[in-house]
């Protein structure tokens, strides 16, 4: 049904996100940079548009001052954590995924064909661009 909707509904359009100013921050819930990387891998391969809320790409956490929830998700960008280390590498990972997505319009706007369930694999194709994605599992 998923592929059928993507492939045949001319009005199909979706905008996906993992965090927003109205939700909890993904990193704030899980505190796991490796999980944030895996989420980025899946997220940046979704069809349609993707909305990256500031800090999704850098593991930005909620404010620690006990403020109101709405303000906690609007905390300052975690610039001081991005000079080096795990969070800097996370940003580089998101940048690489963004460049890949930008270079392959089939990811966001291509026809979708599932190849297998285990490992999960699919092909997306748009005009001359064709991408095959295989989720082989996660690195422990």
Which residues are covered by each model-predicted region?
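Alpha-amylase-like alpha-glycosidases and glucanotransferases acting on alpha-linked glucans and related
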Residues: 1-48, 58, 107, 115-118
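Substrate-binding cleft/loops of secretory-pathway carbohydrate-active enzymes
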Residues: 1, 61-71
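Short, glycine-/Ser/Thr-/acidic-enriched flexible segments
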Residues: 22-23, 57-59, 84, 127, ...
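Extracellular/periplasmic catalytic domains that process cell-envelope and extracellular macromolecules
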Residues: 6-10, 44-46, 68-71, 124-128
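Short acidic/histidine-rich active-site segments
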Residues: 53-63
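Aromatic- and carboxylate-lined catalytic core of secreted/periplasmic carbohydrate-active enzymes
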Residues: 3-4, 73-115
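Short helix/strand-capping turn motifs
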Residues: 49-53, 67-75
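Carbohydrate-binding surface patches
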Residues: 99, 114-140
